[in-house]
């Protein structure tokens, strides 16, 4: 699965956007994945909860919320290899750290590849590939 820098949020409900990752996901699965990406409390506080409309291109939500919804959708999919392009963009430090911990947990179930310009110290085992020049491809 792939999560790019451009996030696709559709003019549908939160549940419908999430189920694009797994059409047969039940409400309990949706709540679990929302908890994983740090949006469960936000969704619970919405009057329509899972039926909250997100607006055209996600106009009813913030950029950080859109990124987390797209990530939640990806985590619902059965894919074992995830490629995330700048998944921490637009997130504050606390949100980045929470997302990092969630991704590390998910990595135990498959392969996680993160493309980023920003690295920070972590006690998690990771492999880093640094490209020496911008036009070098691996």
Predicted features along the sequence, with ranges:
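ABC ATPase nucleotide-binding domain signature
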Residues: 2-8, 22, 57-58, 117-119
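ABC ATPase nucleotide-binding domain helical subdomain, centered on the C-loop/LSGGQ "ABC signature"
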Residues: 15-55, 101
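Hydrophobic anchor residue at the start of the ABC signature
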Residues: 65, 71
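A residue-level structural signal marking coil residues immediately N-terminal to beta-strands
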Residues: 78-80, 110
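Catalytic Walker B motif of ABC-type/P-loop ATPase nucleotide-binding domains
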Residues: 82-86
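Helix N-cap at the start of a conserved alpha-helix in ABC-type nucleotide-binding domains
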Residues: 93-94
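Conserved catalytic loops of ABC-family nucleotide-binding domains
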Residues: 102-116, 120-123
């Amino acid at each position: 699965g792939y999560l790019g820098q451009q996030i696709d949020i559709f003019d549908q409900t939160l549940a419908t956007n999430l189920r694009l990752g797994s059409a047969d996901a039940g409400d309990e699965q949706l709540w679990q994945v929302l908890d994983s990406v740090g949006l469960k409390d936000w969704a619970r506080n919405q009057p329509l909860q899972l039926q909250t409309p997100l607006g055209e291109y996600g106009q009813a939500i913030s950029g950080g919320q859109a990124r987390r919804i797209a990530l939640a959708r990806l985590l619902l999919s059965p894919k074992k290899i995830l490629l995330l392009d700048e998944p921490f963009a637009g997130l504050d430090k606390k949100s980045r750290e929470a997302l990092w911990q969630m991704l590390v947990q998910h990595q135990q179930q498959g392969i996680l590849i993160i493309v980023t310009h920003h690295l920070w110290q972590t006690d998690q085992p990771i492999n880093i590939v640094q490209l020496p020049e911008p036009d070098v491809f691996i």
